[in-house]
Protein backbone atom coordinates (compact mmCIF):
# COMPACT_ATOMS: atom_id res chain seq x y z
CA UNK A 1 0.00 0.00 0.00
CA UNK A 2 2.86 2.38 0.83
CA UNK A 3 4.48 1.66 -2.52
CA UNK A 4 1.24 2.49 -4.32
CA UNK A 5 0.91 5.82 -2.49
CA UNK A 6 4.53 6.67 -3.23
CA UNK A 7 3.94 5.85 -6.89
CA UNK A 8 0.94 8.22 -6.98
CA UNK A 9 3.05 11.04 -5.54
CA UNK A 10 6.18 10.52 -7.68
CA UNK A 11 4.48 9.98 -11.05
CA UNK A 12 3.11 13.55 -11.45
CA UNK A 13 6.44 15.03 -10.37
CA UNK A 14 8.30 13.05 -13.04
CA UNK A 15 5.94 14.41 -15.68
CA UNK A 16 6.49 17.99 -14.58
CA UNK A 17 10.27 17.71 -14.50
CA UNK A 18 10.54 15.99 -17.87
CA UNK A 19 12.67 17.43 -20.65
CA UNK A 20 12.43 16.79 -24.37
CA UNK A 21 14.77 16.68 -27.33
CA UNK A 22 14.17 18.02 -30.81
CA UNK A 23 14.67 20.74 -33.37
CA UNK A 24 13.66 23.92 -31.50
CA UNK A 25 11.81 26.31 -33.79
CA UNK A 26 11.53 30.09 -33.87
CA UNK A 27 8.34 32.14 -34.18
CA UNK A 28 8.20 31.34 -37.93
CA UNK A 29 8.34 27.58 -37.27
CA UNK A 30 11.86 27.07 -38.65
CA UNK A 31 14.80 25.38 -36.97
CA UNK A 32 18.24 27.00 -37.27
CA UNK A 33 20.37 25.54 -40.07
CA UNK A 34 23.95 24.55 -39.33
CA UNK A 35 27.20 23.00 -40.45
CA UNK A 36 29.04 22.96 -37.10
CA UNK A 37 27.95 21.76 -33.65
CA UNK A 38 29.53 24.69 -31.81
CA UNK A 39 27.01 27.07 -33.38
CA UNK A 40 24.14 24.79 -32.39
CA UNK A 41 25.32 24.46 -28.81
CA UNK A 42 25.28 28.26 -28.47
CA UNK A 43 21.93 28.55 -30.26
CA UNK A 44 20.25 25.87 -28.15
CA UNK A 45 21.65 26.88 -24.76
CA UNK A 46 21.44 30.67 -25.08
CA UNK A 47 18.37 31.19 -27.26
CA UNK A 48 16.18 28.16 -26.45
CA UNK A 49 17.55 27.45 -22.91
CA UNK A 50 18.29 23.78 -23.56
CA UNK A 51 21.00 21.76 -21.80
CA UNK A 52 23.06 21.36 -24.99
CA UNK A 53 22.77 21.25 -28.75
CA UNK A 54 24.54 19.92 -31.82
CA UNK A 55 24.19 19.79 -35.59
CA UNK A 56 22.19 16.78 -36.78
CA UNK A 57 21.24 16.47 -40.45
CA UNK A 58 21.97 20.16 -41.16
CA UNK A 59 19.68 21.54 -38.42
CA UNK A 60 20.32 22.34 -34.76
CA UNK A 61 19.09 19.52 -32.51
CA UNK A 62 18.55 20.62 -28.91
CA UNK A 63 18.77 18.30 -25.91
CA UNK A 64 16.93 19.01 -22.67
CA UNK A 65 14.36 21.52 -23.85
CA UNK A 66 11.59 22.59 -21.51
CA UNK A 67 8.20 21.07 -22.25
CA UNK A 68 6.72 24.44 -23.23
CA UNK A 69 9.19 24.95 -26.12
CA UNK A 70 7.95 24.24 -29.64
CA UNK A 71 9.83 21.62 -31.63
CA UNK A 72 9.63 20.65 -35.30
CA UNK A 73 7.61 17.55 -36.10
CA UNK A 74 10.02 14.97 -37.53
CA UNK A 75 9.85 11.31 -38.50
CA UNK A 76 10.72 8.61 -35.99
CA UNK A 77 13.68 7.54 -38.12
CA UNK A 78 15.19 11.01 -38.08
CA UNK A 79 14.62 11.30 -34.31
CA UNK A 80 16.34 7.94 -33.74
CA UNK A 81 19.36 9.09 -35.78
CA UNK A 82 19.72 12.30 -33.79
CA UNK A 83 19.08 10.64 -30.42
CA UNK A 84 21.66 7.94 -31.24
CA UNK A 85 24.20 10.66 -32.00
CA UNK A 86 23.74 11.92 -28.42
CA UNK A 87 24.80 8.55 -27.01
CA UNK A 88 27.84 8.22 -29.25
UniProtKB/Swiss-Prot annotation:
GO terms for cellular component: extracellular region. One of its GO terms (biological process) is defense response. It is found in: Secreted. GO terms for molecular function: sodium channel inhibitor activity; toxin activity. Expressed by the venom gland. InterPro entries: LCN-type_CS_alpha_beta_dom, Scorpion_toxin-like, Scorpion_toxin-like_sf, Scorpion_toxinL/defensin. Keywords: Disulfide bond, Ion channel impairing toxin, Neurotoxin, Secreted, Signal, Toxin, Voltage-gated sodium channel impairing toxin. Belongs to the long (4 C-C) scorpion toxin superfamily. Sodium channel inhibitor family. Beta subfamily. Has the structural arrangement of an alpha-helix connected to antiparallel beta-sheets by disulfide bonds (CS-alpha/beta). This is Beta-insect excitatory toxin LqhIT1c. It comes from Leiurus hebraeus.
Amino acid sequence: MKFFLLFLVVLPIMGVLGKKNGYAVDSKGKAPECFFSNYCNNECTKVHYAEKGYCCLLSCYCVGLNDDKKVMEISDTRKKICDTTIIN
